[in-house]
From Swiss-Prot:
Annotated bHLH domain residues: 100-152
Main location per the UniProt record: cytoplasm
Expression tissues: Most abundant in pancreatic alpha- and beta-cells, less in brain and intestine.
Alphabetical keyword list: Activator, Cytoplasm, Developmental protein, Differentiation, DNA-binding, Neurogenesis, Nucleus, Phosphoprotein, Transcription, Transcription regulation
Biased composition (Acidic residues): 58-77
PTM entry text: Phosphorylated. In islet cells, phosphorylated on Ser-273 upon glucose stimulation; which may be required for nuclear localization. In activated neurons, phosphorylated on Ser-334; which promotes dendritic growth. Phosphorylated by MAPK1; phosphorylation regulates heterodimerization and DNA-binding activities. Phosphorylation on Ser-265 and Ser-273 increases transactivation on the insulin promoter in glucose-stimulated insulinoma cells.
Name under which the protein is recorded: Neurogenic differentiation factor 1
One of the GO biological process terms: anterior/posterior pattern specification
Organism of provenance: Mesocricetus auratus (Golden hamster)
Length: 355
């Protein structure tokens, strides 16, 4: 039995090898490319090492800086983020610049405050509120200056000089009680004559300017020692005195009967009430008695020889050379109830002003 050609070829005879296929060629070309890339990488690494040796430690420093920045960024990421610009490190130069800027700013602020205080002092000399012992605050000075400008503008607009009471009411609008008393004392006017019926500065239980007070029948002649305007308890009494020389005397001259002239010691005319205090120096003494009454005594710092009182009260001033004397008020005036007496004394204390 014979075998076919195909079977014999498949089974026993080896096939002849042909030329290399295209796949083998591709694999060999890829190997050559890899070898060339490796050589190029080695050359680049050698060149980089040579450059690093030439440049010294510059790259190392840069790497360290980059590492530090990376560490700081990591720390910042861990900490809560702050709003606004980042804080720079405070070097000596920056610290000196900061101190210099702070010193310049302090000097500018100091000069500004000095100029403001000087301007306010000049304004205090112009406004009608003169006092040797008290100094107006900044806000009170500005308020009084505003009222003074408004009052003068009203006079110029109307062309008529208003009465003294309305002029002082315009000046004292919105001012505190001490400043009102100073203005009234400067214009020689009783503060009770222009206070409104319900003054917000005064407590409601105190009597107003329209209230009637008992006036004692005794009158003291003291030409050398003035009695304060609140001692007379008369709301219509205006002292005919000459105010101290000042810059605003010419403006206020139409409000007085006689022209204002410079004088050192003002003269008081007419019968005055007994002096209750001088410059607001009070000395109260509490002496309990069987009727639970209080005896108040006023201490005055002037010789008793200068007081010329009626003969019926000659026993009050004992000793011509004694520098201090006490006047019991219970011997001069009496009140029906203790509460009314306290209200009168509180009203007198509220009306104190210093000349």
């Amino acid at each position: 039995m014979t075998k076919s050609y195909s079977e014999s070829g498949l089974m026993g005879e080896p096939q002849p090898q042909g030329p290399p296929s295209w796949t083998d060629e591709c694999l060999s070309s890829q190997d050559e490319d890899h070898e060339a890339d490796k050589k190029e990488d080695e050359l680049e690494a050698m060149n980089a090492e040579e450059d690093s040796l030439r440049n010294g430690g510059d790259e190392e420093d840069e790497d360290e800086d980059l590492e530090e920045e990376d560490e700081e960024e990591e720390e910042d990421d861990q900490k809560p983020k702050r709003r606004g610009p980042k804080k720079k490190k405070m070097t000596k130069a920056r610290l000196e610049r900061f101190k210099l800027r702070r010193m310049k700013a302090n000097a500018r602020e100091r000069n500004r405050m000095h100029g403001l205080n000087a301007a306010l002092d000049n304004l205090r000399k112009v406004v009608p509120c003169y006092s040797k012992t008290q100094k107006l605050s900044k806000i009170e000075t500005l308020r009084l200056a505003k009222n003074y400008i408004w009052a003068l503008s009203e006079i110029l607009r109307s062309g008529k000089s208003p009465d003294l009471v309305s002029f002082v009411q315009t000046l004292c609008k919105g001012l505190s009680q001490p400043t009102t008393n100073l203005v009234a004392g400067c214009l020689q006017l009783n503060p009770r004559t222009f206070l409104p019926e319900q003054n917000p500065d005064m407590p409601p239980h105190l009597p107003t300017a329209s209230a009637s007070f008992p006036v004692h029948p005794y009158s003291y002649q003291s030409p050398g020692l003035p009695s304060p305007p609140y001692g007379t308890m008369d709301s219509s009494h205006v002292f005919q005195v000459k105010p101290p020389p000042h810059a605003y005397s010419a403006t206020l001259e139409p409000f007085f009967e006689s022209p204002l002239t410079d004088c050192t010691s003002p003269s008081f005319d007419g019968p005055l009430s007994p002096p209750l205090s001088i410059n607001g120096n009070f000395s109260f003494k509490h002496e309990p008695s069987a009727e639970f009454e209080k005896n108040y005594a006023f201490t005055m710092h002037y010789p008793a020889a200068t007081l010329a009182g009626p003969q019926s009260h000659g026993s009050i001033f004992s000793g011509a050379t004694a520098p201090r004397c006490e006047i019991p008020i219970d011997n001069i005036m009496s009140f029906d109830s203790h509460s009314h007496h306290e209200r009168v004394m509180s009203a007198q204390l509220n009306a104190i002003f210093h000349d």
